[in-house]
Amino acid sequence: MSGSYPSPKGIHPFLLLALVVGGAVQASKIVGGHEARPHSRPYVASLQLSRFPGSHFCGGTLIHPRFVLTAAHCLQDISWQLVTVVLGAHDLLSSEPEQQKFTISQVFQNNYNPEENLNDVLLLQLNRTASLGKEVAVASLPQQDQTLSQGTQCLAMGWGRLGTQAPTPRVLQELNVTVVTFLCREHNVCTLVPRRAAGICFGDSGGPLICNGILHGVDSFVIRECASLQFPDFFARVSMYVDWIQNVLRGAEP
């Protein structure tokens, strides 16, 4: 894998690889965040088991009226034919009139490597076109290979647990995070919350990282434990996949 990872100052790339492969935990919750204003993040999707309404297991982002971007590992062990995609949600246990529910007609992967947590992105084609408006809207994509500088402020969000032993929240949570470049890889955007234990964790994989109003990351994994203060949180870098995404979207047009 030489050449695949940048070498952060003072960190050998093979040490970073060992940490990622040996200590990665796929992300699923927002630790230390707060409740989002209802329906203020209209691009956020909830992936649920069709037989169990409200059974959120991963997040996603609407990037086109017929497509949701999520993490590839979300459907590694679950058939996409058993999944319902919910848009326009805030309270997952409430029958909100804003909610729109879809099945999946097709999935598109891009060389996902689960051993090294690379290319952790997956496109879900919905069975019909979403009705766009105030509560359901499409997120903006970055330019191909667009980068984020150290210190960029972003927003992570999801319905994952509020702590390791805490229950799963009913309502959407969000957290202000800061982009960091140490202990990161070119395939990822990495973030920390300075000076406090907060971040992503078990249960909200696939959810968005929004920076300057643009979708820059897909919630992917953490190293060793959640909100450790030692390692950043890892998101799949959306800007690496924009050309691939656009090719999929063009190919799906009638």
Swiss-Prot record:
Disulfide bonds join C58-C74, C154-C211, C184-C190, C201-C226. Residues 28-29, 251-254 form a propeptide. GO terms for cellular component: extracellular region; lysosome; membrane raft; plasma membrane. GO terms for biological process: collagen catabolic process; proteolysis. One of its GO terms (molecular function) is serine-type endopeptidase activity. InterPro entries: Peptidase_S1_Elastase_sf (IPR050850), Peptidase_S1_PA (IPR009003), Peptidase_S1_PA_chymotrypsin (IPR043504), Peptidase_S1A (IPR001314), Trypsin_dom (IPR001254), TRYPSIN_HIS (IPR018114), TRYPSIN_SER (IPR033116). The active site is at H73 (charge relay system), D120 (charge relay system), S205 (charge relay system). Its main location: other. PROSITE patterns: TRYPSIN_DOM, TRYPSIN_HIS, TRYPSIN_SER. It holds the Pfam family Trypsin. It is a peripheral membrane protein. Residues 30-250 form the Peptidase S1 domain. Residues 1-27 form the signal peptide. Its EC number is 3.4.21.76. Glycans are attached at N127, N176. It catalyses: Hydrolysis of proteins, including elastin, by preferential cleavage: -Ala-|-Xaa- > -Val-|-Xaa-. Serine protease that degrades elastin, fibronectin, laminin, vitronectin, and collagen types I, III, and IV (in vitro). By cleaving and activating receptor F2RL1/PAR-2, enhances endothelial cell barrier function and thus vascular integrity during neutrophil transendothelial migration. May play a role in neutrophil transendothelial migration, probably when associated with CD177. Triggers inflammatory processes in neutrophils by interacting with ADGRG3 upstream of F2RL1/PAR2 activation. Belongs to the peptidase S1 family. Elastase subfamily. This is Myeloblastin. It comes from Mus musculus (Mouse). The lineage of its organism: Eukaryota, Metazoa, Chordata, Craniata, Vertebrata.
